[in-house]
Each structure stands twice: as C-alpha cells, then as structure tokens.
Amino acid sequence: MSKLILAINAGSSSLKFQLIEMPEEKIVTKGLIERIGLKDSVFTIEVNGDKIKETNDIADHEEAVNIMLDSFKKHGVIDSIYDINGTGHRVVHGGELFPESVYITDEVEKQIESLSELAPLHNPANLMGIRAFRKLLPEIPHVAVFDTSFHQTMPEKSFLYSLPYQYYKDYGIRKYGFHGTSHKYVSQRAADILGKPIEELRLISCHIGNGASIAAIDGGESVDTSMGFTPLAGVTMGTRSGNIDPALIPFIMEKTGKNAEEVLNTLNKESGLLGISGTSSDLRDIQGEAEEGKDRAQLALDVFASRIHKYIGSYATRMHGVDVIVFTAGVGENSDVVRAKVLEGLEFMGVYWDAKKNESIHGEEAFINYPHSPVKVIVIPTNEEVMIARDVINFGDLK
C-alpha cells in the first residue's frame, strides 16, 4: 500500500518540501517557502506541472507549515493532513550521536540542539522546522535524516586528525563529512544501474555543486570523504577555500589586520572560485569567462578540477582500486567541461571515457565511459528527498 511521505529541508528563513508517494518514489508536489520572518515572504508550489507562486507575510516556521498544509488541501493534493503518513527532516549534523536516521522524540530534539555548536548555521534552523511540524502534525511519525550519518562508517584512521588525541575525546574534533544523503543515494542508484550488489562495488562519488565533496564508498559504506569537521575542508568550492595550510590563518590575520572570525569568513565566503577568479562563484560564469580568454577564470577552473582529480586518485588508492566513478549535483550533472578536466589522464587506472558522450550529457542519467572501460563513469542526478523518504519508509511502522 502506498504511503505519502513529506521530505523537509528547513533553513533559517526558508522551507523546502516534497511530498512523495512511496515506495513508487513519485513526486506528488514540491515547493519552497522563502523569506520566512520577513515581509513579502514567497510561497511556491508545483501541482500537476503548474508552478503557483504567492506572496504573504509569514512570521515564522509554524505559520509557514500551516500555509503549506492549507495549500495541499486547497489544490487537492490531500483531503486531510492525516493522508500524510510520515515526515523526514534533513538535519545537517548528527555528530557521533546519530550513525543513522532516528525517530524524533523530545530527547532527540535536545540531542540535535546539543550538536548546534558543530553546525551553528544549520542545526538550529533544522530544529525550527522540526518543532513546527511536530506541533502541527503530532500524530504523524517524524524522522531525522542526518547529512553526517552516512560517513559514520569511516574508520578511525580516516576520520581522526593528527592532533592531540584528547582533543577528539574532549571536544569531538574529527572529520565528520557532509552530503551523506546524496552520496548514499547515488551509490545505491549506481548499483541498481549496473545490476550488481552494492557490497561488491568500490565507488567514488563526486558531489559537485557550489559546495562540493568527494566520498570513497567501499561495499556501500563510506570509508573516507573530503569535507571535514566542517564543510569548509576538502576540494575548492564556489566560495570556500577547501584545504589550506592552517598556519595561513594567523599569517593572514597579521598581514590584513583581520581577526580569526573575519579570516574564517573570508575562507568560507570570499575564496574558492570567487577568490581566484575575482568575479564569480558560479561555475557557469567561470566557464564563460574562460572561453573568452580570461586567465584568472581559466586558472580558477583548473584549480577546481585539479583538486577533485587528486581526490579520485587518492581514494582509488584508499580502496585498492575503483569500479565506478559517479558525478552528481549541479556542476557534476551539468558541466561536461569540469567532468572532462577531472577525468583527463585517468586511463592509467582503467578509466576510458567518451568525450563526445560526455559533451552531450547535461542533467540526465547516463554512462560516459566507453563500453570496454574497466572503470564505469556515470552521471546520476542526485535525489536527497527520495533518500530521506526511503529512510522514513524503512522504519516500517507508519500508520
């Protein structure tokens, strides 16, 4: 029997939602509420292929949820709120407390709140959504799905920093990794496409958007990933620096007069593609400028691809080989230029990719390797909402 599952991603001033029919994984409706707490909040919903946009003053997340539920009934999506069988909430940071998705109770709420120091921009916002939904839909099961959970299978040798061990024990300082829901989805989808048990696959997942992370997935489990204690670590991103020498922070402070918080802001919001190019954090803009012969745009593109390229080599070594490379998220799914730069020169490890096929693939699921290639290369559009809905369904005791 089909179940209706709500997949929710709550930000500090936004609420993204999808209502999904499971197990068919059919999107019934989806939408976004923006500018919550501000004047002229925008509510957008897609029903039967039509996009409907309304402007309201929405004071808080509770009011946003009420408007969303009323809209479902108004547009005939549901007859009653009790048609919804369960709700899955994206939560950015689960720390070591949550190695998997969990039913939300008052105690779980407190634990999520206790992890806010690890994700001060995200966990409090995620909690606002959780509390609003639990208040308005108290009879419906609510499940927290954590970005970090998928990476909790990493062994200590992968997640531990070479710092005094007591820092890990006392303060939880370690690599956590992010984009776990996306990496989990595409790894499972790759196994389905190949018709092979995921337990037999060594897979490198490249989630490349404005934020980007690479994951080594061995037998369906994350064994390493590029992001670290925060999403700042790893590869070059739209505005984030990725890995740098930590000694640069006091050096930059001394040279610029900035304090630590200001330097951290620079690393998070003024670096990456934006910092190198000096013009944009959007890969599409960078590619356009590079085609026009602008040297710094070309340099930004080269650095961006080079960092991903290095992680692929590193993770192939980590798993003693690789069977599948997956490209996903906005850039990974749509930029044949970035994919080509990342894959260039990987023939030595069994990656034979078809340049013409690669150029033709934008935002669709497809192989871009030659048939004889030992390593398969697949573009897979991510679907974190479906992965969230699957986790809710997997609890198995929905009404």
UniProtKB/Swiss-Prot annotation:
Its EC number is 2.7.2.1. It is an enzyme of class 2 (transferase). It holds the Pfam family Acetate_kinase. Mg(2+) binds at N9, E384. It comes from the Bacteria. GO terms for biological process: acetate metabolic process; acetyl-CoA biosynthetic process. ATP binds at K16, H207, I208, G209, N210, G211, D282, L283, R284, G330, V331, G332, E333, N334. It catalyses: acetate + ATP = acetyl phosphate + ADP. Substrate binds at R90. The record marks H179, R240 as: Transition state stabilizer. Pathway: Metabolic intermediate biosynthesis; acetyl-CoA biosynthesis; acetyl-CoA from acetate: step 1/2. It is found in: Cytoplasm. Its cofactor is Mg(2+); Mn(2+). The keyword Transferase applies. The active site is at D147 (proton donor/acceptor). Keywords: ATP-binding, Cytoplasm, Kinase, Magnesium, Metal-binding, Nucleotide-binding, Transferase. Its main location: cytoplasm. One of its GO terms (cellular component) is cytoplasm. Mg(2+). Can also accept Mn(2+). One of its GO terms (molecular function) is ATP binding. Belongs to the acetokinase family. Homodimer. Catalyzes the formation of acetyl phosphate from acetate and ATP. Can also catalyze the reverse reaction. This is Acetate kinase. The gene is ackA.
